[in-house]
């Protein structure tokens, strides 16, 4: 297993945070009816991919991408719940649990 260094992990955390911001802004843009929020969402996605590109310099691509996607989805679910009162049904919860279990398995491999 590859030993992780601080800077790649910091860039991965930044990538996850920017992805969450992008998703929230996209929802708030109301299908790009609020253009500035839509533009900020696109800029956040660009920043997220740029941070992910830096993260994969020190973290294996499969691990970094799985962590970025998985944590991004889980945190977006939480943000949707808190900010927009969106709830998952039982199938959604099962999917989220499987996603998190898959992330753990990839990291342990």
UniProtKB/Swiss-Prot annotation:
Keyword Cell inner membrane on entry: yes
A family per Pfam: Multi_Drug_Res
Membrane topology field: Multi-pass membrane protein
Top-level taxonomic group: Bacteria
Protein keywords: Cell inner membrane, Cell membrane, Membrane, Transmembrane, Transmembrane helix, Transport
Cellular location(s): Cell inner membrane
A GO biological-process term: glycine betaine transport
Membrane-crossing residue ranges in chain numbering: 6-26, 36-56, 64-84, 88-108
A Gene Ontology cellular-component term: plasma membrane
GO MF term set: amino-acid betaine transmembrane transporter activity; antiporter activity; choline transmembrane transporter activity; spermidine transmembrane transporter activity
Gene3D superfamilies: 1.10.3730.20
Membrane recorded as keyword: yes
NCBIfam families in UniProt: PRK10650.1 (NF007934)
Known function: Catalyzes the excretion of spermidine.
Subunit structure: Forms a complex with MdtJ.
Record-stated family: Belongs to the drug/metabolite transporter (DMT) superfamily. Small multidrug resistance (SMR) (TC 2.A.7.1) family. MdtI subfamily.
UniProt protein name: Spermidine export protein MdtI
